[in-house]
């Protein structure tokens, strides 16, 4: 009886461990997907988001991951031409990272497309874009 109980406990542990195991990244050529939220006015947060994007790209390889940074609210200032992060954001775009601007925020803050860094993508609502990406299997990070 004790032996049978011990065997069942061991089997349960093995099955539970297998069920809880995280899937490996980049399995069989599967492309990874990441969406980053930037909604703060702090340059430190912008730099953190850009660092996260670059680190993920470096770790997985640019051809193995789709990365999107969605800027809305006060975070929209990160992707303006006069931003302190301008050169880093431009580098990210050149490296294949999608940078997305929320048109709701732009309208509310009276920001035009001519104020935004070249190469940005525009969506009607930043939060809805993040929701869409999550439903498409993107991992979500808010630095």
Residue ranges and their predicted role:
Residues 1-10, 15-16:
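N-terminal export leaders
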